[in-house]
Amino acid sequence: GFGCPNDYPCHRHCKSIPGRYGGYCGGXHRLRCTC
């Protein structure tokens, strides 16, 4: 979700959440956006 497996859209999504500074793609196929 949120653009994964591309880290950039996920990172931008996480930065939009108050208190979060970014995120990355994780999970078996890097399909989960982790903030």
UniProtKB/Swiss-Prot annotation:
InterPro entries: Defensin_invertebrate/fungal, Scorpion_toxin-like_sf. It holds the Pfam family Defensin_2. GO terms for biological process: defense response to bacterium. Gene3D superfamilies: Knottin, scorpion toxin-like (3.30.30.10). One of its GO terms (cellular component) is extracellular region. It is found in: Secreted. The keyword Cytoplasm does not apply. Its main location: secreted. Disulfide bonds join C4-C25, C10-C33, C14-C35. Coiled coil: none annotated. Keywords: Antibiotic, Antimicrobial, Defensin, Disulfide bond, Secreted. Has antibacterial activity against M.luteus and E.coli. Belongs to the invertebrate defensin family. Type 2 subfamily. This is Defensin-B. It comes from Mytilus edulis.
